[in-house]
Amino acid sequence: MARSVFYYHLKRLKAKDKYADEKDNIKSIFHEHKGRYGYRRVTAEMRNRGFIINHKTVQRLMQSMNIKSQIRKVRYRSYKGEVGRIAPNIINRDFEASAPNQKWATDVTQINIGSTKLYLSPILDMFNGEIISYNISKSPNLEQIYDMLDKAFEKYDKLDGLILHSDQGWQYQHFGYRQRIEEHHIIQSMSRKGNCLDNAMAENFFGIMKSELLYAEEFDSPEAFIKALDEYIDYYNNKRIKSRLKGKSPVQYRTLSQIG
């Protein structure tokens, strides 16, 4: 090898990678979020950290490091039970809210861990997608719905005029459920029969959770999944950023809205 060629390659090896800091932070973000972030969310988090960088550069750097999100959205089957209608579809697919606690959504989804069936029932705020409260049970019963409501009411005691939207599941038709929300001056709204898009906020969360947690990891027991779910919901509320929330997590977005 000619001496000039040798020194040329040696100089290139010694040259500082101008994207070294960016690469370190990209790897840090990717692993912190357990590989759940693609290049767009990584870009938003990089900007939160003070980097001035566009998504194409982040995508190129991730490709050069062979980093790629393995998460893919999947369809899920929610638990419906018997259906009926006792409330109008007030929301009517208008999932926008200008402030917290104007519109909430709830639903129940079935989760299979081995031979055990679990049922997750959360309440989401349509303003920022935050999980207000939730209950996970081995049976889709009224007690889990009441517990979910009680936890939400412990967090917020003034909910006059709030709209709580659900599908036409039997739980939401029950007198006990209706009485509890009426006592807090909450307005009940129900999807049309068999129309999943009418409750897209809740269905979207279930799809994300199942993609990023249930199908991304292995659980040897229902208890292991429940523990992981508790950690995931805390992560989802406090750390997982969304493009529609201007690169903020649900809690960050709510906090900033209240400051402003």
PLM features: what roles do these ranges have?
Residues 1-5, 21, 144, 148, ...:
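Generic alpha-helical secondary structure signal
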Residues 4-99, 195, 251-257:
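Basic, flexible linker segments flanking DNA-binding modules
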Residues 6, 26, 42, 58, ...:
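Mobile genetic element proteins and their domesticated derivatives, centered on retroelements
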Residues 8, 130-134, 188-191, 215-216:
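Short small-residue beta-strand/loop micro-motif enriched in glycine and branched aliphatics
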Residues 80-82, 166-168, 174-175, 190-210, ...:
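RNase H-like two-metal-ion nuclease catalytic core shared by retroviral integrases
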Residues 97-132, 138-140:
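An active-site-proximal beta-strand-loop segment
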Residues 116, 135-157:
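Active-site beta-loop-alpha junctions of metal-dependent nucleic acid enzymes
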Residues 182-186, 208-260:
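C-terminal domain-tail junction helix/linker
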